[in-house]
From Swiss-Prot:
Pfam families: Bro-N. This is DNA damage-inducible protein D. GO terms for biological process: DNA damage response; SOS response. It comes from Escherichia coli (strain K12). Signal peptide: none annotated. InterPro entries: BRO_N_domain. Disruption phenotype: A double yicC-dniD deletion in rich medium makes filamentous cells with little DNA in stationary phase, has no growth defect in minimal medium, does not grow at 45 degrees Celsius. A single dinD deletion has a similar but less extreme phenotype.
Length: 274
């Protein structure tokens, strides 16, 4: 567990069903909100995002009364909200981006939320590298569709517009390298796609870039392609900055797998036929 993520682990609770959950009051303090009332608007925006994504708010935000000590023997009932992992993911997306701990929270809950789509975290750890690549590439494929929709709503209208929009995201994440430069750096042939020649770590960084850009385009009500391009670049740069702060390898420095995603998919199909 990364040291920047450890505080989120330390306040994690496990309910009777074995599900992970967090106290809104504890999370608010960890995220740098000195008073709970300042954190409430963030929770409200997260609830709205939950509802807009088609989820039931009560499934992820459970309001409770928690008895806390206020003296030697006295206790007082305080309102709190029990947050699911997905709720925490939405909360950190709607928090104050100026707070350094928010960046750590965004990476922590984004990674944890993606892993939850598998049976459990242990299953993800036990996957081989090629299985992780297939899983993350499929995730990225689906989220890129949602990113296209969000970009279109923001004013990115044509195929050329979208290519420029995508390049801004890559340039932010890859320290100025656009799609063509990344393609050349990987030594790929003209018909080979860069996303099909990324390892799991690089795919995870790009998945994070895509999901965060989609969220920010919607949250900020972006309504011009110039603004959308800037947003994509800024998110990519922020992901790069977070990788750097956590001591990770820059995306352009990661090794390029010799076996492509297409080859892995074909191997799976052959195995399934046997």
């Amino acid at each position: 567990m990364n040291e920047h993520h450890q505080p989120f682990e330390e306040i994690k609770l496990i309910n009777a069903n074995g599900a992970e959950q967090w106290s809104a009051r504890q999370l608010g303090k960890l995220l740098g909100y000195s008073e709970y009332r300042h954190f409430i608007p963030v929770l409200t925006r997260a609830k709205e995002a939950c509802e807009n994504s088609g989820h039931t708010i009560d499934d992820h935000f459970e309001e409770i009364l928690d008895m806390v000590k206020i003296g030697s023997n006295a206790k007082r009932a305080l309102k709190d909200i029990v947050l699911s992992r997905y709720a925490c993911y939405l909360v950190v997306q709607n928090g104050d981006p100026a707070k350094p701990v928010i960046a750590a929270g965004q990476t922590y809950f984004a990674i944890q939320t993606r892993r939850q789509e598998l049976a459990d975290d242990e299953a993800f750890k036990q996957l081989r590298e090629d299985e992780k690549r297939l899983f993350l590439r499929n995730e990225l494929k689906e989220h890129n569709k949602q990113l296209v929709e969000a970009a279109q709503q923001a004013g990115v209208a044509t195929a050329t517009d979208f290519a420029i929009f995508q390049n801004h995201g890559y340039q932010g994440l890859y320290g100025g390298l656009d799609q063509k430069a990344i393609h050349q750096r990987k030594g790929l042939k003209k018909n080979q796609k860069i996303l099909d020649h990324m390892g799991s770590t690089e795919l995870a960084a790009n998945l994070f870039r895509a999901t965060q850009t989609e969220e920010k385009l919607k949250r900020d009500g972006v309504n011009s392609k110039q603004q959308a391009n800037t947003t994509h670049f800024d998110v990519g740069r922020k992901v790069r900055q977070t990788i750097q702060e956590l001591g990770g390898t820059m995306p352009e420095e990661l090794p390029t797998p010799q076996v492509s995603i297409k080859q892995l998919e074909n191997s799976v199909k052959i195995t399934e036929k046997k």
